[in-house]
Amino acid sequence: AGETYRYFCWAVKDENDPYSFEPTVVQENLPKKRAELEEQYGITIKYIINDAQDWAAKVMEASLAGTPITDILHGGGPFAMLNIYNFSSTGGRLLLQLDEYSDYADFSDPSWWRTELQQSGYFNGHQYFAVPNVIGIEHVALNQVCIFNKSLLESAGYPADKLYEMNQSGEWTWDKFYEVAISCTNPDTGTIGVNVGDSFSLIHSLFSSAGARAVTSETKDGATEVTFTPNTPEALEAWDFFIKLGQAGAVDYRHASGDVEIFLSGNVGMICTYFNRVINIASSKRHPEYGILFPPKQEVEDEYTSDVNWFTPYAAMSQISNPAGAVQLLSLYCAPLYSAEDERNQASVEAELMQ
C-alpha cells in the first residue's frame, strides 16, 4: 500500500491524458480500471510521458545506468522486443523474468493472454514479455487486407462486383492481383497499381500466402537461436513475384504509416496494409470510394491468409523497488478489459464498426 508504480508507453505525451491513442472502448473503460486497482491495492499508477524520438533508448539507457525511469514498459510492438531484451548486449539483465513471479501473476491463461504469440517473448528459456489478448475492433484491426480504389479499378476493367466475386470464389490469386495492378498502372495519368503499404506490408502478405517466414526461432537446451530466413524456397517465390510487379512498373514504393495519405491521393489502385487503415480512410472527407479484399493467395487451391504481424508486448524492469508488485500490476492493468469469452467483446466490435 502507498506505492507508486510507473508506467511508460511510447504514445503518451501528456500524463493527464494518457488514453487518447487507445481504441474507443479502452478510452472509456481503462480509467475506471486504473481507479479500481489504485483503490483496491492502495497504490498509484503514474504514467511516464515520452519526450524522446527514440523512446526505447531513453528507457533502456536509464536502466543501464541503474536508474530505471519506469516499472512497467509498453514494448511498442514486436519490432522493439529484441533490442529491449538485449540492449547494449545485456541479454535480458535489464528486465525481470516474468516466469520467476508465478506466485504473483499468471500469463498462461489464453482467455487473457496471447499464449502463442507470447512465445516470441521467451529468451533462453525465460519469459521477458507478456502479450495480452485484444478486444473490440482490435480483433481485426491489425489483420492484413487489400484496400482498393473502386473508381480506378473499374476504369481499368475491374468493377468492384467482379473483384468481390473473385475474392468469394477463391480466384483472387497472385496472377489476378498482378493482372489488376498492371491494368490500372498508367504513367501518363500518374496512376499506379499497388502501394507497398506500411513497412512493406505487401511483402509480408506475400510471404504469408507462400508459407514463408522472415524470421524463425528454435530453443535447444535452454538457449534460443533466432534466424533470419528470407531465402527459403517459399520466400524466394514471394520475392520473385514482388520483383516481377516492380519490373512492370506497377509498384509504388512509398511506405510507413503515411500509407493512408498515399491512398487518399486517389492515384493508387490498391494498397496492402492493416485493416485499421480503413477507419482512417473512412473518417476522411476526401476519400475515394474504396473496397476491401483479402490479400491475394498464391494459387486457387490455397486458403486465403490475413496475417497479424503486430502485437503489443509488455515488460517489467529490473532494479526497481518492488519487482513482484510490478509484475502483479502488469498482469492486472495490462490484461484486456474483458476475457476472450466475454460477450462484451463482440458487442464492442460491432459498436466500433458502426462509428
Predicted regions and their residues:
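Hinge/lid segment of periplasmic solute-binding proteins
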Residues: A1-E3, W10, D51-Q53, M81-Q144, ...
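Conserved N-terminal structural module of periplasmic/extracytoplasmic solute-binding proteins
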Residues: A1-S88, A340-E341
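Extracytoplasmic/periplasmic solute-binding protein
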Residues: F8, T67-L73, Y122-C146, E154, ...
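Short helix-initiation/N-cap motifs at beta->coil->alpha
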Residues: N50-K58, S169-K176, D252-L264
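Paired acidic/hydrophobic, glycine-rich loop segments that form the ligand-binding mouth/hinge
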Residues: T70-H74, G269-Y274
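Short, solvent-exposed loop/beta-turn-alpha elements that line the ligand-binding surface or hinge
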Residues: D103-W112, S155, N167-S169, R213-E237, ...
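Glycine-centered hinge/linker elements that transmit conformational signals in sensory
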Residues: W174, Y178-S183, S217-H255
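Extracytoplasmic/periplasmic substrate-recognition and gating elements
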Residues: S283-E352
